[in-house]
């Protein structure tokens, strides 16, 4: 992808990128470098993203890999961690093309740590069969990558190649085109005003939704904005029951944990356990070998679930365990932790813990959403003109549980591929692609975006095996297209008072006992973001069962009437929009969790008839879209 690729072609296309994590920054740079007009909207400052907080690194098998490592091994590790639910084609793309995009980062100023011989320093993390984790600044990989990309973006802006608009919260997507079904721009809040921007395509790179839960590694901006934006224009979403909880987030003081923003989480990187740290309970017992043969290096879902089960067994389900990194210092020598993990050493010290001699209290925390907006391998969603990449998207590459350090890599590989799709370099149509049954690992059908004609949202979307029990109804705010004069900005034409957004509605199974609906809602109390996060943690967190999930659904439905008042679309309060997005995301997650009655990967139901296991074939995939019922394929 170079500027020459568009030479002699039509006028430059305009790509509107929403989000400034690794997928958004990298794709914006690539599109601009190829000659496209690029507008980059970021909700806060450019550094406000999950990427900035990423510590462990980026997994990749380089031209000169660690001894014994291969791309095939990376593929196998990813498929195994994904519990047999991965789209194998997407995994092959991810692992095969990784080295290309690592080199691409180098073009934009990213530098990774080197070992004493001047070669890339490769770390080992849980569920990887060989050291293949690139890191920067020791344990500050995300910050290092983000800083370099942001600097280059600002250089591009100074050269007139990218238009950056910070503190621009996108509230809706504009629809236009001949049938009024194509995304033609984005409406956003900026400086106390509603504004809009036209684009030939909009790329959602908005990250995840960790703020759904009381304890999260995500910053305050992670409020499911992209998922909600896509859903409201009819895009299909999938795999929402799979939310990964990182096993080792440092437990803050009680008053800090209750802060709704949870804006400064401290994730204790997977790499610390890769270097030899172990987990102990309050009795000093190393318990992970009791739950999995790989102990602390088991996949994340296994470690998080084991911690939760062990705490419940000890009668302290809301408690914490301890990470013992002192063993690393004993094995590697004094000063190793400070050199290998300088940021963590500083942060734990600021929290009053000397982790070279003391234990660190940790507990699972919401970390990464495997599900998201359904896309093909070039970022195309089921809605024409709408692309998605990174955590907000669902290519199927992460399966039911993400392998450590594959998230930044996903943003790179599929961010670049989304730009290729936008520029028409993918060999297919740059427009939306319908859902169709495709072959995955083991040959079972799965719902995957591919092909060329736009999807008809009036028809039924299918997945393989099981139907949802009722239609999902969510009238979308009808948006007029932004005028086609290609002015960069225009007053937002979204008139929220014309059509009022309403909550998702479906029939829940009856709760035990009379008046259970009212009782459940009474326990939930009045809506607040803190109440929502506590509800989701208690009833749809690491450990789930049918009763808890149904209770969550009832409470969420009751809250929805209060959180979606008439003035939401026109509100100038960002938190009003965020609350609406979080509530929608919570409803979709809970509905998906209810439908998957068996345990799989990060979705653990204690009432499942079988224990979670790595399966050989691609499992049934739950895909939903607005006003669409799911039926047997």
Language-model features: locations:
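Conserved redox-cofactor binding core of oxidoreductases
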Residues: 106-194, 198, 205, 249-258
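Glycine-rich loop(s) and the adjacent beta-strand/alpha-helix scaffold that form part
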Residues: 201-256, 266, 405-421
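Short beta-strand to alpha-helix junction loop
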Residues: 86-99, 133-151, 165, 216-224, ...
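FAD-site-proximal beta/loop scaffold in flavoenzymes
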Residues: 172-191, 196, 353-397
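N-terminal Rossmann-like FAD-binding beta1-loop-alpha1 element of flavoenzymes
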Residues: 14-40
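An anion/pyrophosphate-binding glycine-rich loop and adjacent beta-alpha core
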Residues: 46, 229, 235-353, 421-427
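Glycine- and aromatic-enriched mobile tails/lids
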Residues: 2-13, 30, 34, 45-46, ...
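Glycine-rich active-site loop/strand segments that organize a redox cofactor
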Residues: 60-94
């Amino acid at each position: 992808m170079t500027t020459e690729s568009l030479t002699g072609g039509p006028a430059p296309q305009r790509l509107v990128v929403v989000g400034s994590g690794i997928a958004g920054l990298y794709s914006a740079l690539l599109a601009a470098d190829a000659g496209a007009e690029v507008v980059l909207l970021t909700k806060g400052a450019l550094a406000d993203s999950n990427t900035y907080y990423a510590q462990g690194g980026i997994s990749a098998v380089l031209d000169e890999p660690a001894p014994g490592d291969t791309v095939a091994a990376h593929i196998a590790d990813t498929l195994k961690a994904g519990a047999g639910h991965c789209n194998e084609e997407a995994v092959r793309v991810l692992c095969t093309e990784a080295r290309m995009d690592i080199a691409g980062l180098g073009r934009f100023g990213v530098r990774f740590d080197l070992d004493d011989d001047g070669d890339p320093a490769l770390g080992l993390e849980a569920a990887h069969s060989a050291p293949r984790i690139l890191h920067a600044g020791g344990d500050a990989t995300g910050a290092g990558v983000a800083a370099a990309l942001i600097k280059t973006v600002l250089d591009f802006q100074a050269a007139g190649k990218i238009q950056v608009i910070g503190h621009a919260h996108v509230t809706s997507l504009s629809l236009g085109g001949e049938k009024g079904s194509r995304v033609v721009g984005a409406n956003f809040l900026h400086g106390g005003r509603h504004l809009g921007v036209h684009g030939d395509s909009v790329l959602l790179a908005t990250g995840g939704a960790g703020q759904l839960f009381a304890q999260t590694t995500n910053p305050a901006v992670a409020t499911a904005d992209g998922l909600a934006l896509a859903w409201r224009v009819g895009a299909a979403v999938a795999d929402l029951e799979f939310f990964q909880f990182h096993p080792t987030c440092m437990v803050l003081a009680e008053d800090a944990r209750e802060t709704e923003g949870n804006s400064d989480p401290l994730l204790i990187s997977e790499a610390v356990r890769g270097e030899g740290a172990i987990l102990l309970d309050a009795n000093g017992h190393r318990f992970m070998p009791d739950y999995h043969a790989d102990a602390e290096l088991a996949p994340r879902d296994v470690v998080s679930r084991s911690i939760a089960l062990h705490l419940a067994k000890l009668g302290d389900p809301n408690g914490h365990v301890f990470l013992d990194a002192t063993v690393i210092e004993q094995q590697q020598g004094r000063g190793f932790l400070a050199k290998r993990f300088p940021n963590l050493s500083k942060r734990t010290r600021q929290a009053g813990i000397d982790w070279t001699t003391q234990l660190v209290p940790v507990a699972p925390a919401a970390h990464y959403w495997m599900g998201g907006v359904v896309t093909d391998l070039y970022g195309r969603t089921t809605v024409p003109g709408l692309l998605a990449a990174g955590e907000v998207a669902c290519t199927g590459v992460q399966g039911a549980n993400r392998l450590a350090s594959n998230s930044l890599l996903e943003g790179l590989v599929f961010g670049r591929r989304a730009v290729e799709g936008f520029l028409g370099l993918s060999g297919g149509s740059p427009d939306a692609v319908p859902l169709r049954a495709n072959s995955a690992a083991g040959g079972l059908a799965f719902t995957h975006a591919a092909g060329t004609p736009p999807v008809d949202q009036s028809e039924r979307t299918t997945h393989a095996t099981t139907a949802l029990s009722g239609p999902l109804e969510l009238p979308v705010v009808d948006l007029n297209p932004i005028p086609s004069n290609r002015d960069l900005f225009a007053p937002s034409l979204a008139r929220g008072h014309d059509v009022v957004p309403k909550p998702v509605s479906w029939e829940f199974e009856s709760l035990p006992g009379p008046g259970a609906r009212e009782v459940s809602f009474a326990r939930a109390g009045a809506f607040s973001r803190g109440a929502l996060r506590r509800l989701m943690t208690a009833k749809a967190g690491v450990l789930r069962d049918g009763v808890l999930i149904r209770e969550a659904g009832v409470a969420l439905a009751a809250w929805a009437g209060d959180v979606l008042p008439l003035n939401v679309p026109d509100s100038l309060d960002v938190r009003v929009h965020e609350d609406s997005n979080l509530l929608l995301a919570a409803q979709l997650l809970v509905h998906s969790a209810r439908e998957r009655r068996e345990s799989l990967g990060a979705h653990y139901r204690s009432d499942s008839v079988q224990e979670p296991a790595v399966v050989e074939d691609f499992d049934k995939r739950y895909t939903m879209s607005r006003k669409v019922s799911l039926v047997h394929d």
